[in-house]
Curated annotation (Swiss-Prot):
Domain of life: Bacteria
Protein name: Large ribosomal subunit protein uL13
GO MF annotation, one: mRNA binding
NCBIfam families per the UniProt record, alphabetical: rplM_bact (TIGR01066)
Entry's family note: Belongs to the universal ribosomal protein uL13 family.
Role: This protein is one of the early assembly proteins of the 50S ribosomal subunit, although it is not seen to bind rRNA by itself. It is important during the early stages of 50S assembly.
PANTHER family per UniProt: LARGE RIBOSOMAL SUBUNIT PROTEIN UL13M, RIBOSOMAL PROTEIN L13
Bias (Basic and acidic residues): 71-81, 89-99
Native species: Salinibacter ruber (strain DSM 13855 / M31)
Entry annotated with the keyword Ribonucleoprotein: yes
Disulfide topology: none
Region feature (Disordered): 71-99, 125-148
A GO CC annotation given for this chain: cytosolic large ribosomal subunit
Subunit architecture: Part of the 50S ribosomal subunit.
Length: 148
């Protein structure tokens, strides 16, 4: 019997090969798009996935300002921030956030779906979000992401 086929594969950080993917967020639902992006960033779409190693790929999101919410979330959802000072608690609707920081909505949704800690922070750095249709990563030859 071949015992090699029963061994669990553990990826090593220097052996990981990373691809680049591009996603068009136009008319995509924010939460569903974010879960697909988080899956690719984490590396769970690969057979070489290892939980304690960053095996994920790079993801470029274009047209992030055109992503949408379902239901009444566009008006009722709130993003909270706190400056640390008394009276420094502020709430913003997605409409306000989209006008001020168009990439914030996608970045916040994806970050919430990644692990907290050093591995999650390193994983999040592989996400590149742009409000318009152009991005500066043409040299990496990104492929379109199938599921998103």
């Amino acid at each position: 019997m071949d015992t090699q086929s029963f061994k669990t594969f553990n990826a090593k950080p220097d052996e990981v090969e990373r691809d680049w993917y591009v996603v068009d967020a136009t008319n995509q639902v924010v939460g569903r798009l974010a879960s697909q992006i988080a899956r690719v960033l984490r590396g769970k779409h690969k057979p070489t996935f290892t939980p304690h190693v960053d095996t994920g790929d790079y993801v470029i999101v274009v047209n992030a300002d055109k992503a949408r919410f379902t239901g009444k979330k566009e008006k009722q959802k709130e993003y909270h921030e706190y400056s640390g000072y008394p009276g420094g608690d502020h709430s913003h609707s997605p409409e306000e956030m989209r006008a001020d920081k168009p990439t914030y909505i996608i970045r916040e949704a994806v970050e919430g779906m990644l692990p907290t800690g050093p591995l999650g922070r390193d994983t999040f750095k592989k996400l590149k979000v742009y409000a318009g249709p152009d991005h500066p990563h043409e040299a990496q030859q990104p492929e379109p992401l199938d599921n998103a």
